[in-house]
Amino acid sequence: MDVVARLASQRAVVIFSKSTCCMSHAIKRLFYEQGVSPAIVEIDQDMYGKDIEWALARLGCSPTVPAVFVGGKFVGTANTVMTLHLNGSLKILLKEAGALWL
């Protein structure tokens, strides 16, 4: 989990993704459309991808991707992120983490 914690704390928003996952693509688009430039970790293309996926599973990510971290804290996977977006809470989290300026 150390590698996940280290990567998650490097930027205001970090998305652990797989390049072939349609839900990962949708979540990345959501953040881009909000004006956020997240760090993207494509675990299927990372040499430590299996270790990262295992660590995400231990955090409770099911499925393991997309896994979204805001301000270094695990926010959730696609369902949770979409719920936060729809109820307006995601924008608040992004502002608090310094990922949004407006």
UniProtKB/Swiss-Prot annotation:
Q: Does the keyword Isomerase apply?
A: no
Limits of the Glutaredoxin domain = 1-101
Against CDD domains, the record matches this protein to: GRX_GRXh_1_2_like
Which residues take part in binding [2Fe-2S] cluster?
C21
User: Which domain of life does the protein's organism represent?
Assistant: Eukaryota
Cellular component terms, GO, for this chain's entry?
A: cytoplasm; nucleus
* Task of the protein: May only reduce GSH-thiol disulfides, but not protein disulfides.
Protein name listed in UniProt: Monothiol glutaredoxin-S10
